[in-house]
UniProtKB/Swiss-Prot annotation:
UniProt name for this protein: N-acetylmuramic acid 6-phosphate etherase
E.C. code: 4.2.1.126
Entry similarity comment: Belongs to the GCKR-like family. MurNAc-6-P etherase subfamily.
Pfam families: GKRP_SIS_N (PF22645)
Enzyme class: lyase
Pathway(s) annotated for this protein in UniProt: Amino-sugar metabolism; 1,6-anhydro-N-acetylmuramate degradation; Amino-sugar metabolism; N-acetylmuramate degradation; Cell wall biogenesis; peptidoglycan recycling
Keyword Lyase set for record: yes
Amino acid sequence: MQLEKMITEGSNTASAEIDRVSTLEMCRIINDEDKTVPPAVDRVLPDIAAAIDVIHAQVSGGGRLIYLGAGTSGRLGILDASECPPTYGVKPGLVVGLIAGGEYAIQHAVEGAEDSREGGVNDLKNINLTAQDVVVGIAASGRTPYVIAGLEYARQLGCRTVGISCNPGSAVSTTAEFAITPIVGAEVVTGSSRMKAGTAQKLVLNMLSTGLMIKSGKVFGNLMVDVVATNEKLHVRQVNIVKNATGCNAEQAEAALIACERNCKTAIVMVLKNLDAAEAKKRLDQHGGFIRQVLDKE
């Protein structure tokens, strides 16, 4: 696909005079364009749901979720991956973010990194990619060689693959087994795909990881019941989670959390089933960590 023919490289008529308007009008133009992103994501919800089901199946079988991208796309993958351990209590290696150019590229532009097909393959080899893993290639343009080569390598190994881009029929979309393609149109600043395209990608990644965690029993109701309390704010959140899930008061919630070494799931089952910490943990283990199953089946 030629660069000049890509939707993400097109000229946006709504912002053609943006350098001549007031600051407030400038903000209105940008905000109006941003409003078009959620509907674009809405149109690809079936594709996102299909990807979540595949990711969950692979992760349940011992695989990992691997994000692969360059520039803004790579940074968004790293952002999503880095939030999973504290929010859902998973091991840091379960969701992995890889960026063309390595860690230095998180804060700096690395010239030519996104054009390196070898880089995409080597980065996946360096994390010992296996057929159990799912590789999600992220590229607004859909033409990034680093991502395309990584997806090709992943498929050769037998991995399930997902391609996220904002141009229909792109190489990323056709290379991956599953394509998620929110069409957000031309950017306010021509070609600046960190804007609408980046926002769309962030929304999609939010759904992929959150959907995976919900289906993995990391959410009860709408509560993040595997949250790790790494600071005072999260200690308070744990207490509130147990309170909201059980109807107990703060003192009872804190006592239960202390008794089970601050594991929200165990504390919730302790309170709701009137069990000690050891028995509550045992029942959770018997049901794969799903609070709902403990409550519904016992």
